[in-house]
Every structure is written in C-alpha cells, then in structure tokens.
Amino acid sequence: MQESLLNSLCARRFAIHARWDTLLRTERVTSPLAYPDALVHLIEWALDQIFTLLRDPTVRKRAEHAGGRGTARPVCPCGRSPLLAFFLAGEQALLEALVLEQAAHLPIDPSERDAALGELYYVVRTLARREVDAFCAVCQHRHDGENGGAHHGHEVVHAAGPAPEEAHKAEVVATKPA
C-alpha cells in the first residue's frame, strides 16, 4: 500500500473506530462474550496491529502471493467465537475507509487500487485468523463441530444422542403397533 494512502487511512482512524463500533452493534450476538460492549475495547488494539502490519514491507509480497482478497476468513468450528463478528465488522469499516480515501484521490492506478485492497484483506484476515485460532484453542466447544453437530452459532447437537424430547418421541413411535 502506498505510504500516502496508508497515512490517509491512519488519519481516518477515529472515523474507522466509530464505524467499526457501529457495525459491531449490528452483528448477531453468538455468546455473552460477543456483546459489543465486551468487544469495543479491542478496536484500538486491533487498529494498532493492522496499521503496524500494513507498514511492514514484507506484507505486500505475502499479500500478492496469497492472492489478497482470496485470503480466507477465519473459521470457528462451533461458531461461537465473538471475534468472528468483531473482525468482520472491522474488515467492513476498513474497507469503507479505503474506498472513500481512494475515491478522494482519483484518478488512481487500478493495479495500485487492487494491491491496496489485497493488502488490507490479507492483513485483516491474517490477524483475524490468528486471534480466532487462539480463542478456539481454549474454547470448551471447540470439538462440537467434529461430532457432526450443527455449526455457526446454532445449537450444537452432541453425539451422545438426541435431546430428551426427541428421545421420548422416538420411544413413543417405536412402541406404536404397525
């Protein structure tokens, strides 16, 4: 990312923070830790990390190699990580700021525009994956998805068997004459 564009993004830090906060409050809450009031204090830390990574000269090469926008978002087996919504809101806020900043400096070279976008996606998603993976490593539900249960914030059905109501229905059906 060009230094001037990065400096302009840094100058928008307050607006990015405010937008991130707003977007975070529109996300679905998947657990008590995912309440926006529990997460907003992480925004400044995350912005520090993101701007530091964007200034790292090796990031451009890694982003180009990774395909930038093709960099995968983090995955949480049980879907309960509060950081999924946190980083999704942050990615959106940063993307909006980048697009507004680029539009303010038209005309812009399409390859530079795409490179900046790729670097932003790469940095945000790499940081998000690192933090989600760390959270998932200590999560009590991290193996729920491996048992064939539901994912992505839905109630997990454990391999131990059906819920008591379902077990009772199955018993009633099994005892009815054919």
Describe the predicted segments one by one.
Residues 4-5, 62-178:
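Long, amphipathic alpha-helical coupling/dimerization segments that relay conformational signals between
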Residues 1-82:
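N-terminal low-complexity or simple alpha-helical regulatory segments
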